[in-house]
Regions:
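Short amphipathic alpha-helical segment with a characteristic S/N-K-E followed by hydrophobic residues
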Residues: 30, 45, 68-73, 83-84, ...
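Short hydrophobic/aromatic patch on the recognition helix
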Residues: 56-66
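Hydrophobic alpha-helical connector segments
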Residues: 75, 85-117, 168
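Helix-loop "lid/cap" segments that line or gate small-molecule binding pockets
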Residues: 102-109, 117-126, 196-202
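Amphipathic alpha-helical packing segments from all-alpha helical-bundle domains
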Residues: 109, 115, 129-155
Length: 210
């Protein structure tokens, strides 16, 4: 048991490095362990026992903060994908869409978030809790940002006034996830820009700029 009395059910002592609050250190270690295990073997590899072993904590410590391994896995993914969705001020709707789609491609191809997303998306098909967390924590906030871009473009006259926001969001981002999961074609910045260009060709207003 650790010095603070929160050792796990396996009686294991928990690792600690100086200079960080114990709770923050443990949470980060758990989330990183969950992410590493999912990259290596999917959600089935990220059991509470395996996460605890890799993080150097007891299972009771994990259950104190998360109800299931799916919840740990999702937060571990969010940790890896932090600060991946921002826009500069004053850009057009067209440029904002390009920035967002290129950012998604970079995240999935240049960081561990790509393998993690593949694992989470696969396991979410048979795990309702994980699927809900994926929608609520990852997809919904990002769709909200992009939807605001589209609404602004429609209001300014850059994009069509009768724009179907939800369908357009699917047209813009679904190709990225399709290539990430199935790997049938290159997932790179050139593809991201081509995708946005094709969508923009159909949603710009007659007076809208490039």
């Amino acid at each position: 048991m650790g010095a603070d009395g929160t050792g796990g059910v396996d009686g294991k002592s928990e690792r600690r490095s100086p200079g960080r609050p114990r709770s923050e250190e443990r949470r980060t270690a758990i989330l990183e362990a969950a992410g590493d295990l999912m990259i290596q073997g999917g959600l089935k590899a990220a059991t509470m026992g395996a996460i605890a072993e890799r993080a150097g904590v007891g299972k009771a410590t994990i259950y104190k903060w998360w109800p299931s391994r799916g919840a740990v896995a999702m937060e571990g993914f969010m940790l890896r994908a932090a600060n991946s969705w921002s826009l500069p001020r004053g850009v057009s709707a067209s440029e904002a869409l390009r920035i967002l789609v290129v950012a998604a491609v970079r995240l999935f191809t240049h960081t561990p978030a790509g393998p993690l997303m593949r694992a989470i998306a696969a396991d979410a098909q048979s795990d309702d809790e994980l699927a809900r967390a994926l929608r609520e924590q990852w997809l919904a906030p990002r769709r909200a940002v992009a939807a605001e871009v589209l609404r602004g473009g429609a209001a300014s006259g850059e994009l069509r006034a009768d724009l179907d926001i939800e369908t357009t969001l699917d047209l813009v981002f679904a190709p990225v996830y399709h290539r990430l999961i199935f790997g049938h074609g290159a997932l790179d910045e050139a593809f991201a820009k081509r995708t946005v260009a094709h969508v923009l060709a159909g949603i710009r207003s007659e007076s809208g700029g490039a």
